[in-house]
Amino acid sequence: MNILRKIVKNRKDEDTQKPSPASAPPDDDDLWLPPPEYVPLKEFTSKKNMRNFCINGEVKVCSPNGYSFRILRHILRSFDEIYSGNHRMIGLVKVVIGLALSGAPVPEGMNWVYKLRRTLIFQWADSRGPLEGEELEHSQEITWDDDTEFVGLQIRVIARQCHIQGRIWCINTNSRTCQLWSDMSLKTQMSEEDKDSSLLLE
């Protein structure tokens, strides 16, 4: 197991030294470091900056030659550099992408469409999250192309404040979602007031 971790670490170090995010993705897609342990975010009642948001998320994957999550993960590793929206929404967009892509796709022409409709609870640090009553929306298209492959991602996320009781925003499993979150470097920390909760810092 230690040998595997060293191999993965060395591979990750090599990836970070690559000058261009459009370089070819690694062939060993099964090698990845699991992200920090994600645990359910419990119900909070006394938090002034805790708000429930109804989330609509849609991710379209377009590729004439099919696609693999190896390619998607390669694209999303550089998400911080290519994100074009409101920075207060970047953490939420990352989570929605991960959750949406881990669900069941629906064919739509040449596209595969993943949709997420779920009530999520977030806590932002330093008042960086949405303002009271604010609605956030983000749409973006990301493409990856070389001589052999073309993959396009169309992302649309809408967050509206609502008063429905939410459940969790993260899943403590070694799932495809966690792989995507790990690739996108989602910033979290354990709550000082509740050891069973992870807080979103962005």
From Swiss-Prot:
The record marks 95 as: Involved in the inhibition of stress granules formation and contributes therefore to virulence. One of its GO terms (cellular component) is host cell endomembrane system. Residues 115-151 are annotated as: Essential for glycoprotein binding. A motif (PPXY motif) lies at residues 35-38. Its main location: virion. Changing residue 11 to C: In strain: Ni-CE and Nishigahara 2001. Keywords: Host cytoplasm, Host membrane, Host-virus interaction, Membrane, Phosphoprotein, Viral budding, Viral budding via the host ESCRT complexes, Viral envelope protein, Viral matrix protein, Viral release from host cell, Virion. It is found in: Virion membrane; Host endomembrane system; Host cytoplasm. One of its GO terms (molecular function) is structural constituent of virion. Residues 1-33 are annotated as: Disordered. It is a peripheral membrane protein. Pfam families: Rhabdo_M2. It comes from the Viruses. The keyword Nucleus does not apply. GO terms for biological process: viral budding via host ESCRT complex. Changing residue 29 to E: In strain: Ni-CE. Belongs to the lyssavirus matrix protein family. Late-budding domains (L domains) are short sequence motifs essential for viral particle budding. They recruit proteins of the host ESCRT machinery (Endosomal Sorting Complex Required for Transport) or ESCRT-associated proteins. Matrix protein contains one L domain: a PPXY motif which potentially interacts with the WW domain 3 of NEDD4 E3 ubiquitin ligase (Potential). Homomultimer. Interacts with nucleoprotein and with the cytoplasmic domain of glycoprotein. Interacts with host ATP6V1A; this interaction plays an important role in virion uncoating after viral entry. Plays a major role in assembly, budding and uncoating of virion after membrane fusion. Completely covers the ribonucleoprotein coil and keep it in condensed bullet-shaped form. Inhibits viral transcription and stimulates replication. Plays a major role in early induction of TRAIL-mediated apoptosis in infected neurons. Inhibits the integrated stress response (ISR) in the infected cell by blocking the formation of stress granules. The avirulent strain Ni-CE does not block the formation of stress granules. This is Matrix protein. It comes from Rabies virus (strain Nishigahara RCEH) (RABV).
